[in-house]
Structures are given as C-alpha cells and as structure tokens.
Design a protein with these regions (language model features):
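Active-site beta->alpha loop and helix N-cap motifs at the rims of alpha/beta catalytic domains
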Residues: 2-132, 136
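Catalytic alpha/beta core domains of metabolic enzymes, predominantly
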Residues: 116-241
C-alpha cells in the first residue's frame, strides 16, 4: 500500500520526464508514489508506447509506485484489450480509472490490483460495489489548470468525508512552485484556494484541515526548499492517523 499520509507524491509527464528526473532521483528507493497520465493526446506520437514503457519500468526499478491515469484512449494507443495486463507490462502499481468503463469492468480490475477512482465523478453506489470487491481502492480528486475552476472548501471537505466514510483512502493535488505546467502556468491545485500558495502550506492544509490520505504535487517542478519543508512537516507532525502501508 501507499506510505501515506506522511509522505509526498509526484506527478510525472512524459514530455518533461528528462527535466523532472533530477528531482525524482532524490526519492529513489522510498516507495514514493508517482502519478502519470497515459492518455494525454498531445504527447502521442510513433514512439509514445515505447517511451511510456521505458519510463514506467525505470520508475518501478528505482522503487517508485506508479499510478497511471487510463481511459479507453489508453487502450487504443497501446493496442491492448486488458488494462491489467498492460499494467503488468509497464510495471504499474495502480490504475486510476478515468472515463469509459462500467462498474463491473472497474470491479473486475479492482479484484486484481489497486484501483484509484475519480473522486469527482464516482457515485455512492459505484463506490460501495467497487470497494466491496477490490483489494485496495482509493479515490483521487482532480487538479485544475485554470483559475477559478478548482474545488471550493466545502465541496472538497464534504466529498472527501463521504468517500472516507465508505472506506476509501482519498488523494488530492497541490501546486508546484519552481516549474509550472503549461499552457496556462497558473499551478495545478485541487483546491482553488491553494492556487499561488506555497506547496508546503497547501500540503499542510490538505493533511490537517481536510484529512487527506495522500497528497501529490501536480506541477512538474518543486523547489528543494519546499520539498524539504514538506519532509520536515511529515517528520515533525507525525499526523495521528494510521498509515495505509
């Protein structure tokens, strides 16, 4: 299971992997979770599948736990009929299921490997059925590139509490500070109030006020100063919640 909540996860983009590796290299061998989307159309080219497999297998080799965001588009791009088999091929730890799959399809996958649901779209009925059949089922909030589109405080708190009451661990995103993802370059927070906030402050807010089980920086870049502040927060506060390891 993920070593949460006393840790930080990262988001990785194939188009910026070379520049991001210098940051990720400092977290090798720690079981750090990495979120990676496998259905970003603008990244698709004739080398995409090979590059994706190389990056995912490299991350697994260095001890990272890769959560891949997948959709029907992913299956078309890789020419596969079974996402669980693709996960084995790419050495993925978990699949974050996006659009295009039925409750039964997701439940079948959840019986075989960790599954992450979309916290904004999953229904209470779906949650109960999938969690009842799955070995490890999580819910992940989205991040929001454009100003004024992120979640508000009341909605985030209520949704998170509902999902946790159903037995799911809930994950969310904070913005980076050193290298923001384009084309908007306004940060990628889950909570609109965190846009422009220091990552360490946003991390502490999600951990303490919202009781988030796992927190990922969504932008490609996090400064060493902010990474160290988050590490210190995790070490010193020792949030009084059972780890899901």
């Amino acid at each position: 299971m993920l070593p949460l909540p006393n840790s930080l996860g990262f988001s990785l983009y194939l188009s910026t992997f070379a520049g991001q590796w210098s940051t990720l290299a400092g977290w090798t061998g720690t079981g750090t979770p990495v979120f990676l989307s496998l259905h970003i159309s603008e990244e698709f080219d004739e080398t995409y599948c090979r590059r994706a497999e190389e990056v995912c297998c490299m991350l697994a080799y260095h001890g990272f736990r890769v959560i891949a965001d997948v959709s029907r588009k992913t299956m078309e791009q890789f020419g596969c009929a079974d996402l669980v088999e693709l996960a084995k091929q790419l050495e993925l730890w978990a699949l974050r299921i996006d659009y295009g799959f039925t409750r039964n399809e997701i439940s079948a996958m959840a019986e075989k490997m960790p599954i992450v649901l979309n916290a904004s779209t999953v229904t209470a009925e779906d949650t109960a059925v999938i969690a009842g059949r799955g070995r490890e089922v999580y819910a992940m909030h989205n991040f929001y590139p454009r100003p004024e589109t992120g979640l508000d405080e009341d909605y985030l708190l209520a949704t998170t509490r509902t999902l946790q009451s159903a037995g799911l661990k809930v994950l969310a995103f904070i913005p980076g500070d050193e290298w923001l993802r384009g084309p908007v370059f306004e940060g990628l927070p889950t909570l609109e109030a965190h846009r422009g906030m220091l990552p360490s402050a946003a991390f502490a807010d999600l951990a303490i006020r919202y009781g988030m089980d796992g927190i990922f920086v969504a932008d490609p870049g996090l400064s060493r100063t902010e990474a160290n502040r988050i590490r210190m927060f995790c070490q010193e506060t020792k949030v009084d919640r059972k780890s899901v390891v």
